Amino acid sequence: MARSVPLEKVRNIGIAAHIDAGKTTTTERILFYSGVVHKIGEVHDGNAVTDWMEQERERGITITAAAISTSWKDYRVNIIDTPGHVDFTIEVERSMRVLDGVVAVFCSVGGVQPQSETVWRQADRYSVPRIVFVNKMDRTGADFFKVYGQIRDRVRANAVPIQIPIGAESDFQGIVDLVEMKAHIYTNDLGTDILVTDIPAELQETAAEWRSKMVEAVAETDEALLDKYFEDGDLSIEDIKAGLRKGVLIQGNDRLVPMLCGSAFKNKGVQLLLDAVVELLPSPQDIPPIQGTLPDGEVALRPSSDEAPFSALAFKIMADPYGRLTFVRVYSGILQKGSYVYNATKGKKERVSRLIILKADDRIEVDELRAGDLGAVLGLKDTFTGDTLCDDQNPIILESLFIPEPVISVAVEPKTKNDMEKLSKALQALSEEDPTFRVSVDSETNQTVIAGMGELHLEILVDRMLREYKVEANIGAPQVAYRETVRKAVKAEGKFVRQSGGKGQYGHVVIELEPAEPGTGFEFVSKIVGGTVPKEYVGPAEQGMKETCESGVLAGYPLIDIKATLVDGSYHDVDSSEMAFKIAGSMAIKEAVRKADPVLLEPVMKVEVEVPEDFLGSVMGNLISRRGQIEGQATTNGTATVSAKVPLAEMFGYATDLRSMTQGRGIFTMEFSQYEEVPRNVAETIIAKNKGNA
């Protein structure tokens, strides 16, 4: 079966931004103007197409990355609408991994917010080309050029306006297209009647100035264009469009980031945004081939072509009335309904029963997915987020996703004993869908513990248990994910010897333990020479150390950011075994940690609070009382913004306190920043409590 749309006319894009910048509304307008929906949905009415979960419609925030297919002109545009709330960072992360381009939406009033910076960093991690849409130009305090300055300063992007607004706030009438040097004036409320005319006289000088900056930036992307620019002092419209597209695809800090503007809510600027998506953002063919690892450890590339061997990445699992949906991005080859695929990550074959593409709530069955397509597979039982699917004759493992560690946990139990089985089924299904949601059983208390990225994250998952799985649950008080580490380098040994008739046990290792770089977890290196510890016992010794690191010596929290080097040891020809060396490894690491000045670490959050200026003093005082460090403050149009680093342990219940301090007018965002050492007096209390002495 031939392709319905040529690969060069496919665009896989994400719409990403800070909470409340207007992403979902922008997506809704794109669907309206491209003909997928015939009535505009509003987030605040609770009927947006992409917000299809009940909680999303109630809360007016987007939680899961809904994938929708639409068309513009003769292009197919696959859109993923991502959440802006920091508790749902994994949704943004997984969409960035499978996209070719991003529309970053910024509020013209709020500008670059902490979550915008997080999203930008995620796009940087996967080197995703992007364009910027400065939304809400009709709002009081709208300032396109202020946002331009913030994007250049705060996320260090090479931003290039290709439009400027005509008016602002209630006087926002339209847009100047700097490429064509024409004004687009919107003459009706639906944004369908557009008058393309000359630029108003009062804006001509400003437009000429910004066009000149744009042309200069475009010329610098290509030597031939630069020569033309020096000769003629200008570039043709065709040259500008070609140069912009080339500039967007540059890898690294010189990449151009074209800036557009509009008001999705007032239906202004969305068609021009769609034009920019198809003209400037890449097709699957324009991005570098996906890289993976072959079974022999060699690195291989898979070109985005139907003829190449099949490879795809599973980027999301979702429970659905249809069945278990596995969302995939096909990078190469063709995936057919009814075929068998090889899960290279798990080493298992699975059968594809059906293939579907989504238009929000609508499921459309298809016979195949081709290179560059996004779709969902039914029938896969053992495939999870981050797994590679491929042709078993040409196995490959693609680079997986970066999955952040949870920072908060709570104990959970069903309200009635009869619901125990339903609870465990619900927890299993939810943890399959969301890799940042972890479920474990506390070995001492036998309680089920759930962990996630924040209070809202866990609250929504508990809510889903009730709505989707009909399980009522009691939730304990939130617990902070403390960690332990060491502060100095030491040498220690572990010797396990047991001789009591019959076969004995003998394992002996000597290790050096030292602090490692933050974020490295547990690192192990073997420097054994001369066979003092045979190769087959090095792995078990490492395993023993790793398992022991799951429970530290101070308060039983996992040990992180440590490096253990195996330097010496001894063995017995008859009595040595894997188990003996595993125990010796465990003994060595325990001994080393005790000697290496162990300390307690706590998650510290990056907090940004926005409040009316009058409340600034009390809000700052409150943050300081929570062991917060103020990192900066700014005031714009009577609104003060405070940035601080605050331990997560001090942030529980902050939303309620902020509301009462500011008469409900304060808002805040919070995201994980880093682990830091807990002050001694606080650490003593935590350690005593954990040992049952509090």
Curated annotation (Swiss-Prot):
- State the superkingdom: Bacteria
InterPro entries this protein is in? Answer: EFG_II, EFG_III, EFG_III/V, EFG_IV, EFG_V, EFG_V-like, EFTu-like_2, G_TR_CS
Q: Does the keyword Nucleus apply?
A: no
| Keywords on record | Cytoplasm, Elongation factor, GTP-binding, Nucleotide-binding, Protein biosynthesis
Pfam families reported for this sequence: EFG_C (PF00679), EFG_III (PF14492), EFG_IV (PF03764), GTP_EFTU (PF00009), GTP_EFTU_D2 (PF03144)
Q: Which Gene3D superfamilies does the UniProt entry name for this protein?
A: 3.30.230.10, 3.30.70.240, Elongation Factor G (Translational Gtpase), domain 3, P-loop containing nucleotide triphosphate hydrolases, Translation factors
Q: Which GO cellular component term is one of those annotated?
A: cytoplasm
Q: Where is the tr-type G domain?
A: 8-285
One GO term of the biological process aspect: ribosome disassembly
List the Gene Ontology MF annotations in alphabetical order.
GTP binding; GTPase activity; translation elongation factor activity
Q: Is Iron one of the keywords UniProt gives this record?
A: no
- Locate the residues binding GTP: 17-24, 81-85, 135-138
Instruction: Give the location in the cell.
Output: Cytoplasm
Q: What does this protein do?
A: Catalyzes the GTP-dependent ribosomal translocation step during translation elongation. During this step, the ribosome changes from the pre-translocational (PRE) to the post-translocational (POST) state as the newly formed A-site-bound peptidyl-tRNA and P-site-bound deacylated tRNA move to the P and E sites, respectively. Catalyzes the coordinated movement of the two tRNA molecules, the mRNA and conformational changes in the ribosome.
The similarity comment for this entry is: Belongs to the TRAFAC class translation factor GTPase superfamily. Classic translation factor GTPase family. EF-G/EF-2 subfamily.
- Name used for this protein in its record: Elongation factor G
